[in-house]
Design a protein with these regions (language model features):
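A ligand-binding cleft/hinge motif common to bilobed small-molecule-binding domains
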Residues: 89-99, 151-157, 190-219
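Sec/Tat signal peptide C-region and signal peptidase I cleavage site
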Residues: 17-21
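Bilobed "Venus flytrap"/periplasmic-binding protein-like clamshell domains
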Residues: 31-55, 90, 114-191, 195
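Extracytoplasmic small-molecule ligand-binding "clamshell" domains
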Residues: 22-93
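Bacterial N-terminal signal peptides
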Residues: 6-16
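Short helices/loops that flank or line small-molecule/ion binding pockets
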Residues: 71-85, 98, 171-174, 179-198, ...
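Periplasmic-binding protein-like
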Residues: 24, 30-34, 110-120, 173-174, ...
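Acidic, polar ligand-binding/catalytic clefts
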Residues: 67-131, 143-145, 156
Length: 287
């Protein structure tokens, strides 16, 4: 009888220990941009020091989960699979904020004013967004934040959009619409303009814009600014834990481990979110 009691007690202790260890683990999802090229190892190496820093600040082990596909991170957040998540594309992050499933606790310093530039050839006749009617505009991946912002620009300008190929049946419709095509990466956009596949191209990569303008290319228009690379916490986390994570991120530059994490990730730091900007951006993107 005593032996059975001891065995049962031992099993209970093991199970309780396992539960305690599981409760201490924070799942940190990481979703980078789809239009930039980086390997999973490069991304994990970048974020590991940040995960360790958050772990020390919260007293919990942090497990990194790389989620490259936007639809996968959407599905995961719908089920609160991540306690903390870093998301490059603002439209994916802010859809979760609007839905109440997650809260933005910090934005990445230097990435709160992400803008899209529409590139055109210097010898072209385009002078305004309205001149894009009947023309072709190339964007990066359709589910990228860049493409999402382009659609918001056109929608704000009351410009009809289409992805259809021109033919005899839709010729009249095409004349009054902007035909939008896509390529995977931002740095491929200039190729489409230079080779006549599109009359304008959208990019948010400053290096691409600089290279284009340095050789005489022009910028037709620039979008409003949007904060990208957001850090969100699950609304299912206790409020005090949400606050510990927020405070740790905002104060990351005040300690050596924090500075080391910033060096590894390549960012200057994190800043407080702005509810007014957040609400305005959600509305502009049509989320």
């Amino acid at each position: 009888m005593k032996y059975r009691f001891a065995v049962a007690l031992g099993l209970a202790v093991v199970m309780a220990s396992g539960t305690s260890a599981q409760e201490k683990e924070l799942v940190f999802g990481v979703t980078e941009g789809v239009t930039y090229q980086a390997t999973p190892k490069e991304i994990r190496d970048k974020f590991t020091p940040l995960a360790e820093y958050v772990g020390k600040a919260t007293g919990r082990r942090v497990k990194i989960v790389l989620v490259p596909a936007y639809n996968d991170v959407r599905a995961g957040m719908a089920k609160h699979e991540y306690d903390l998540v870093f998301i490059h594309p603002a439209h994916v992050a802010m859809a979760e904020v609007k839905g109440g499933r997650y809260k933005a606790v910090a934005w990445t310093s230097g990435f709160t004013d992400y803008t899209v530039s529409l590139l055109i050839n210097p010898e072209g006749t385009l002078k305004s967004l309205d001149d894009l009617k009947g023309r072709t505009l190339v964007t990066p991946d359709p589910d990228s934040i860049t493409a999402m912002m382009v659609r918001a620009m056109l929608r704000t300008g009351k410009l009809p959009m289409t992805t259809a190929k021109p033919d005899a049946q839709n010729a009249k419709e095409m004349e009054g619409s902007v035909r939008v095509i896509s390529t995977r990466y931002q740095d491929a956009v200039p190729f489409y303009i230079e080779n006549g596949f599109a009359q304008a191209g959208a990019t948010a990569a400053k290096s691409v814009v600089k290279s284009w303008t340095d050789k005489g290319g022009k910028v037709l228009a620039q979008s409003r600014a949007v904060p990208i690379k957001q850090l969100l916490v699950s609304s299912a986390l206790p409020a005090d834990e949400q606050e510990r994570i927020r405070a740790a991120l905002l104060g990351i530059g005040q300690s050596k481990p924090g500075k080391d994490a910033l060096d590894a990730i390549g960012y200057k730091g994190f800043v407080a979110t702005n509810p007014e900007v957040e609400a305005a951006t959600i509305a502009w993107l049509g989320l």
